[in-house]
């Protein structure tokens, strides 16, 4: 049975052990067929992925064998977590409608001339939906660029917090009805679907940061971290109120200030992926978290 997160609070470091534990458990069940029968993941026939660039995965290099190329208009890669998840679950009726730069309105209107509204991908037969949306409506990119500019004047202070004041909290509250509407409309179009609202990976650490490689003033790092936590919490509340399951992927220790073999989100000068976006490791970790919510164990090589 799917479990529903009660809160969008940051993960304890112990949660990092979840994919490993799931993989170990699945291995032990191979030797016990009777037990395995009771632990099988639910089967899905028709999966639709909706969302923005944290779903689409712009500019992630092909680090695994794939026959498909990124969709250039939406900068959608075959290395994103929905594609990984569909492959792990053996789902062949899979539509990835996610698109870089998408805002909530792009779920209802064409984002480009040749890109239909994302919600058009849903049908009454759709039985699995993952969603990641509202980061662009909140203005992640604009806020980070403004804070980078502000940091030049006072890298040890909190100039961005002074610049925005309570505005970011208000942005989160203003987005509530839009996010609520998305999950209500998904339920109406695909009433039998299991719907998972996927949160945003941690971008910045809790404190200090790594100025100047990521030019956010030390005092502004916790300010922005709290803003992202508030956005994830709002998404969780509105999605769960409409029958969706929130998947908390906000696990600390994988932010832009970490080394390339540890971070899940790239910094302003990326090595694999777009600036301040998930990299391959981040997408793989997200697939692990979503899979665990569905009872799908991570591949053994992922958990190693």
Predicted regions and their residues:
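Secretory targeting and sorting signals
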Residues: 1-38
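Serine-esterase "nucleophile elbow" of acetyl-processing enzymes
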Residues: 39-98, 119, 148-153
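Structural recognition of the beta-strand scaffold that forms the well-ordered cores
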Residues: 46-51, 55-57, 93-98, 127-132, ...
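Short, solvent-exposed beta-strand-terminating loops
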Residues: 52, 56-58, 135-149, 199-207, ...
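A structural motif corresponding to the C-terminal end of an alpha-helix
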Residues: 84-93, 177-195, 230-248
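Short, well-structured alpha-helical segments in soluble
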Residues: 108-125
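Serine-dependent acyl-ester chemistry module
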Residues: 142-170, 202-228
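Catalytic His-Asp segment of secreted/periplasmic serine-dependent ester chemistry enzymes
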Residues: 201-303
């Amino acid at each position: 049975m799917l479990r529903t997160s009660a809160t969008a609070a940051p993960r304890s470091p112990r949660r990092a052990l979840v994919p490993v534990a799931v993989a170990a458990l699945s291995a032990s069940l191979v030797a016990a067929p009777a037990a395995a029968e009771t632990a099988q993941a639910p089967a899905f026939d028709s999966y639709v992925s909706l969302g923005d660039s944290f779903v689409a995965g712009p500019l992630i290099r092909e680090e695994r064998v794939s026959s498909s190329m990124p969709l250039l208009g939406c900068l959608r890669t075959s290395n994103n977590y929905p594609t990984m998840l569909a492959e792990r679950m053996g789902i062949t009726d899979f539509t990835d409608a996610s698109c870089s730069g998408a805002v909530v309105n792009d779920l209802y209107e064409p984002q480009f001339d040749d890109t239909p509204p994302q919600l058009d991908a849903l049908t009454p037969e759709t039985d699995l939906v993952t969603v990641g949306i509202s980061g662009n409506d909140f203005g992640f990119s604009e806020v980070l660029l403004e804070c980078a500019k502000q940091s030049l004047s006072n890298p040890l202070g909190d100039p961005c917090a002074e610049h925005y004041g309570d505005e970011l909290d208000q942005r989160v509250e203003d987005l509530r009805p839009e996010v609520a509407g998305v999950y209500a409309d998904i339920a109406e179009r695909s009433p039998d679907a299991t719907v998972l609202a996927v949160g945003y990976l941690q971008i910045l650490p809790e404190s200090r940061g790594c100025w100047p490689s990521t030019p956010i003033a030390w005092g502004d790092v916790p300010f922005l971290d709290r803003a992202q936590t508030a956005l994830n919490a709002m998404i969780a509340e509105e999605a769960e109120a409409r029958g969706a399951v929130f998947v908390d992927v906000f696990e600390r220790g994988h932010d832009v200030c970490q080394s390339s073999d540890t971070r899940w989100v790239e910094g302003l000068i990326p090595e694999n992926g777009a600036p301040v976006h998930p990299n391959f490791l981040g997408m793989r970790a997200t697939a692990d978290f979503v899979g665990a919510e569905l009872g799908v164990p991570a591949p053994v090589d992922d958990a190693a």
